[in-house]
Design a protein with these regions (language model features):
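Core catalytic lobe of class I
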Residues: 1-308, 312, 320-323
Length: 323
């Protein structure tokens, strides 16, 4: 039965390619496509889960802003000062969004939620990376789009976001910080509602969705993950500004398919790290990326990222367990 389901999923993923430029990595596929257009074109109830890290400034991944980032001119990207001889990576200025841009962000995620709702099977989960500044806005908008808010996954990680002294007045106010140093990353866990009268067990039988997969040791998936920052070797493989570590993504991708069957989708696949995580643990995935530079980067990066051994694969070294 499981082999038949896997074979059916592999056939289904072929039909999701449509007429888009694409490449394959193992059993997974990445398309050069705009996710709004693509998700609107594919049949309803096509994918089992979504794991993604979307562009929160909306405009920070516009082509002109990416060019400014590459040239070191900033734009929406804040180019932090170096310290201890180390250069800090550019970060998008979420606090730079004015009311009009926040309204644009709201429309963006409302429309995105609607096409995601269309693409997901009933009971399909969405794992969506966010940040403390905008998560309350984005999660609320996704609820308006029709998705259920289930809970929040908290990734404990020490970042370089926040904690800065007042800009251009660092010497005048040396004992002040504009914001707390960020030490966690919120991920929204949402779900497409089950059909009326359907129980979780019914949904699992009919759609292979509705629940979360337990950890390999049999324990339940937890809503806190102690994480590392993305290691240097992974960043060398995939120079993407919001690259998440494989040790984190593999845990999330594992949880997203309760029976270990189905198709994971990353609509903002960037360097392909979610697809790489899916390949590493042996599940099917499909990613879409509209920026040709990142699309081509993922062609090179995904096989390398998928082949990495992380702490979660080493016996006795599950470094990010709550136990």
């Amino acid at each position: 039965m499981l082999q038949n389901a896997q074979h059916t999923d592999e056939q289904r993923i072929e039909h999701l390619i449509l007429d888009y430029k694409h490449f394959r990595v193992g059993r997974s596929v990445i398309l050069h496509a705009d996710c709004f257009e693509w998700m609107g074109r594919i049949p309803e109830n096509s994918v089992h889960a979504i794991v993604t890290d979307p562009p929160y400034g909306v405009k920070e991944y516009d082509f002109d802003q990416l060019e400014k980032r590459s040239n070191g001119n900033g734009g929406i990207w804040r180019i932090p000062p170096s310290f201890d001889g180390h250069e800090r990576a550019p970060l998008p200025r979420f606090t730079a969004l004015n009311p009009k841009e926040r309204a644009t962000l709201r429309r963006f995620f409302l429309e995105w939620g609607k096409v995601a709702f269309h693409a997901l099977r009933p009971g399909g989960h969405v794992f969506l990376a966010s940040n403390a500044f905008l998560s309350q806005l984005v999660f609320g908008v996704l609820i308006e789009s029709g998705l259920e808010f289930r809970t929040q996954l908290v990734r404990i990680v020490r970042t370089l976001r926040g904690g800065d002294r007042p800009k251009n007045a660092e010497d005048e106010f040396p004992d002040c910080s504009s914001l707390p140093r960020g030490c966690y990353e919120p991920w929204g866990i949402l779900r497409k509602p089950l059909l009326p009268g359907m129980r979780v067990s019914d949904c699992l039988r009919e759609y292979q969705t509705g629940a979360l997969r337990r950890k390999p040791d049999g324990g339940p998936f937890e809503d806190v993950i102690y994480s590392e920052r993305t290691p240097r070797d992974e960043r060398d493989m995939a120079d993407h500004p919001s690259l998440k570590p494989q040790s984190l993504l593999r845990q999330i991708v594992h949880a997203a398919l309760p029976l270990g069957l189905g198709i994971i989708m990353d609509p903002f696949s960037g360097s392909g790290s979610t697809v790489a995580a899916a390949e590493a643990i042996g599940v099917l995935s499909i990613g879409t990326e509209r920026h040709v530079g990142y699309f081509e980067m993922s062609r090179r990066a995904v096989p390398k990222l998928a082949g990495l051994e992380t702490a979660i694969e080493r016996p006795g070294q599950l470094a990010f367990s709550m136990d």
